[in-house]
C-alpha cells in the first residue's frame, strides 16, 4: 500500500510531528472562529505556499489535490445555493486552507511518526480506562495507509470499466470498491490478531 509521505528536507519535513499536529489544530481553530475574507484568503495563500514546498512535481501535487478540489466544489455549490456569495465564500476558504495545510502535514510526516505521536498524546487518556492509546494510534495509521489505496483502487476500477466499454457510473464502481476494501480490512484484521498487535491490559 502506498503512503502519502514525500521524501524531502524542507522546513516542513524538519519540523517535529508534534509541532505540525499542534500547529494544524491551532490553524483549524483560528480558521473556524474567523469570518474575515481577507484573513481567510491569506490563510489559503500561506497553506498553498507551504504545500508547494513539500517537493512534489506540479503535476503530482495537483493530482493529489483532485479529491480535495471535488470536495471544495461540492461545498461551494451548496453554500452558493443557500447563501449570498460573501457568506458562501467563508466556509470554502476555511476548508481550502485547512485541507492544503493537512495535505502538507501528511506529505512531510511518515505514518510511523504519526502513529507514535498520536499514541503519545493519547496516553494520558488511558487513565480513564475507556480508551487504549495504542488502538488510537493503530486506527489512525490504518486510515492513513488505506486512504491512498482506496483512491488508487477506485481509479483502477474506473479505468477497467472504460477499457471494457462500460458506462462509468459511481453506483457501478462503488460495489466492487466496497467489496475489495472489506476484503482488505478482513486481511488486515486477521494479520493484527495473528501478530497480537493489540495489547490490552487485563
From Swiss-Prot:
Membrane topology: Multi-pass membrane protein
Stimuli inducing this protein: Expression is repressed by biotin.
Record carries keyword Transport: yes
Subcellular location, principal: membrane
Keyword set, alphabetical order: Cell inner membrane, Cell membrane, Membrane, Transmembrane, Transmembrane helix, Transport
InterPro entries attached to this UniProt entry: ABC/ECF_trnsptr_transmembrane
Domain of life according to the entry: Bacteria
GO cellular component terms listed in the entry, alphabetical order: plasma membrane
Transmembrane segments: 21-40, 44-63, 68-90
Localization (cell): Cell inner membrane
CDD domains linked: EcfT (cd16914)
Function: Involved in biotin uptake.
Self-association and partners: Part of a biotin transporter complex composed of BioM, BioN and BioY.
Family stated for the protein in its record: Belongs to the CbiQ family.
Name of the molecule in the record: Energy-coupling factor transporter transmembrane protein BioN
